Amino acid sequence: MVRLGISIYGVSRKIRTGEISPIEAFEKICKMGAEVVELVPFGFNLVETPELKKDFKHASARLGVPIGNYSLNANFLMLTPEKYAAEMARVKQHIDMTSDMEIPTIRVDSAAFSRPMSENTIEKFEEELPLIVSTYEELCDYAKPLGITVLLENHGFHANGSERVRQILTSVKRDNFGHQLDVGNYTCVDDIPEIAAKKMISFAKTVHMKDFYLRPAHRDPGGAVEFNCENSWFRSVNGTFLRGSILAQGDIDIWDVMKTVKYSGFDGDIYLEYEGMEECEYGTYVSFSNMKRIYNEV
């Protein structure tokens, strides 16, 4: 059954500044009407603070809102063998934590978001694909006895784009591996979200609804900062200017994407992931209200 939820990432600015606690953030997005919540550990660490892990479980039970996914940044590429082993051990700790919290899925990246743009070529991707595949297979094998499904999100500028993501998904031969389809992130590699969603929805276990303003490379809006997707304009791999927006106020046809998701047979969780420059609680609230309305309209 489809559940409409919110990623805590949308209000993580206030967590990182200490304006609200992680539990207060969870409570706020539950009060916005989320049927399920995604945890993203920006401003907190559940592996290092077991008491906070308990607090989240208690808050989830008290409010009647489950935690459906845990989203973890990771990087397994361009590392020494020692650093690769350390990263694998770190991610496995987070898989253990996900199991302890009875969260069914964990999103794990293969490449760093801030990886140099010159290293994001198709030639480099094809060179690194065997390592990406073996990494996810090891993570899936570790996660399976714990009942956890590992998710690949189209995130960043390397393991992104419908063709690259499809290649990874079809190469990893594990039944507890799937796709977290992020509508907005496809624009980071100049993939067309409305078309990418149609290509990739059959692989999706969860969906991120996210919107961006888009400006062509020759129309510099000013203030762009490389890799800063939260507080400014930034650029795609081919120079398109991108800026996060309130859902349905940007340039992605959210109605078209939502129709694709709704009538595809998808029956997982749809999370609002707000990444705009507005005050983050306001931006998350309006975006989630729009997401619910559009889901019912299409």
What are the roles of these predicted feature ranges?
Residues 21-42, 101-102:
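Catalytic domains of carbohydrate-active enzymes, especially glycoside hydrolases
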